[in-house]
Amino acid sequence: MKSYHKELWLNIEKRMDFINITPEVEQAVIESGIKEGLCLVNAMHITASVFINDDEQGLHRDYKSWLEELAPHEPLSRYDHNLTGEDNGDAHHKRQIMGREVVVAITKGNLHFGTWEQIFYGEFDGMRNKRVLVKIIGF
């Protein structure tokens, strides 16, 4: 069994946004040389997420609206976490809702997706460098 890892660095210019990182993950699979295995894609920050869904802008707008309803950024006083001097209590909740990582099967050297599935990085406290880990294991 082989393993391979790669780190993706992102700096999203908005507080909240979703970026399709499927091409970067596909490139990591090619670089790994692994034909059959698993690919873990993991947000390495507690205010960011990795998830799988359709790359459809209306859906992304719906997610942003829904997340803001569930965990609004303001008022900042809503979150005890913000009493520490932070202003990102909402971002921690949004990450918890959207999840930390995904695992995708690798079959014949390709990510094995269902119809329309793509891998997204979700940012909830942007405007700084953040890291995504891609860890691939297999044969």
Task: Report residues per predicted region.
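Active-site histidine-anchored catalytic micro-motif
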Residues: 1-139
